[in-house]
Amino acid sequence: AADGEWTIRVFPNKYPAVNNDKSECCDEDFYTSAYGNGIHEVVVDTAEHSEAIHDFSVKHIAEVLKTIRLRYNEMMKNPDIKYVEVFKNCGPESGASLMHSHWQIIAVTVVPREQKVICERNNEYKLKNGKCAVCAITEYELDKKIRIIDESDNFAAYTPFASRMSYEIDIAAKKHIKHYGDFSDEMLDELACM
């Protein structure tokens, strides 16, 4: 971009859900609690205030995905960080306080309970069946072709057998990839097309 112009910006969240000062617990008689420690960033994916992701070119979506991967990998270099969540808010109904199109990345020092349970169940499945549960589900869905919405060389998009919410779609890599930070540029280019 030309001087002063930008297409994607990343900055610390002005009102972070977590902080990075490694605060200790705060005790209150019977209860013990801990402050949410971590990193909270905003990824603004367009300079245009009225644009939304469906207005973006595939190339621009790929650049957004690569920016998120870059921030993910940078956050995971911190030995205190155990879990990174990436999400996109769209409008006030989703809790967005910033109307401009953006994503949020929250990196925390503990694995959230729900994610820990998912990881434990995946590990149990792998011990019993010799493969990752996500890979097994993706293979099953690709074989049955009942819930497949879209498919590319490296990805499959499908509705879960038991959705937790309306319009839920899972997008999974066809081959086992440990985490988002391991996706290649080519894979993210392909994912952007979906």
What do the PLM-derived regions correspond to, one by one?
Residues 1-194:
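HIT superfamily nucleotide-processing domains
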